[in-house]
Amino acid sequence: MTDFLPAFWAVIPAAGIGARMAADRPKQYLQLGGLTILEHSLLCFLDHPRLKGLVISLAVDDPYWAALPCAHDSRIQRVDGGRERSGSVLNALLHLHAQGASDDDWVLVHDAARPNLARSDLDNLLGQLADDPVGGLLAVPARDTLKRADSDGRVVETVDRSLIWQAFTPQMFRLGTLHRALADSLVSNVSITDEASAIEWAGQSPRLIEGRSDNIKVTRPEDLEWLRQRRSEFGR
């Protein structure tokens, strides 16, 4: 049963090119088990009964999106991406406002190249944060020993990992709160790496919700190969 979970909007920033993949197209359009990475990233949201709608931010000259079957899904709306991730997300939020979405609506921002989001993680995030005053994100506690390096690549110190988490997506915040944080950070020329960092800069503390470690982001070729080996596990 999902009736107790809050309704939400999804935002997918997908205007990047993923240069580290060294592929012939943006990494979100590479194939994975018969679908593109992007399609896998969208499906967990499109299959959720509490989804109010989804906004995807794409490069203005994106030649691949229109060929995907999901491009014709009436629940998906396209906007132009920005120069950086934060600009792409902000454009999507502005579009939601223009469509009449409320400042109090929940928005979940998810990486276009993170195709292995488990439905159980999505439901847990929604349930845990439904009444949270700030919002939060899926994350995983650091498992490996962490080293801080100098500019020459030599170890300076070993970092205490007991309080270190690896940030994942989705990241879930109120539309108005996230909009203001992103807009203000851009005006102030602050470097924003994800939505949670914008909320932190605005003086609030997002909540960490532990998720599955296999909700990985495809960044390098070996990430895609690992996912291809596990594609039979999709749809959990």
Swiss-Prot record:
Belongs to the IspD/TarI cytidylyltransferase family. IspD subfamily. It comes from Pseudomonas syringae pv. tomato (strain ATCC BAA-871 / DC3000). The keyword Transcription regulation does not apply. Its EC number is 2.7.7.60. GO terms for molecular function: 2-C-methyl-D-erythritol 4-phosphate cytidylyltransferase activity. The record marks R20, K27 as: Transition state stabilizer. The keyword DNA-binding does not apply. This is 2-C-methyl-D-erythritol 4-phosphate cytidylyltransferase. The record marks R161, K217 as: Positions MEP for the nucleophilic attack. InterPro entries: IspD (IPR001228), IspD/TarI (IPR034683), IspD/TarI_cytidylyltransf_bact (IPR050088), ISPD_synthase_CS (IPR018294), Nucleotide-diphossugar_trans (IPR029044). PROSITE patterns: ISPD. NCBIfam families: ispD (TIGR00453). It catalyses: 2-C-methyl-D-erythritol 4-phosphate + CTP + H(+) = 4-CDP-2-C-methyl-D-erythritol + diphosphate. One of its GO terms (biological process) is isopentenyl diphosphate biosynthetic process, methylerythritol 4-phosphate pathway. Pathway: Isoprenoid biosynthesis; isopentenyl diphosphate biosynthesis via DXP pathway; isopentenyl diphosphate from 1-deoxy-D-xylulose 5-phosphate: step 2/6. Catalyzes the formation of 4-diphosphocytidyl-2-C-methyl-D-erythritol from CTP and 2-C-methyl-D-erythritol 4-phosphate (MEP). Keywords: Isoprene biosynthesis, Nucleotidyltransferase, Transferase.
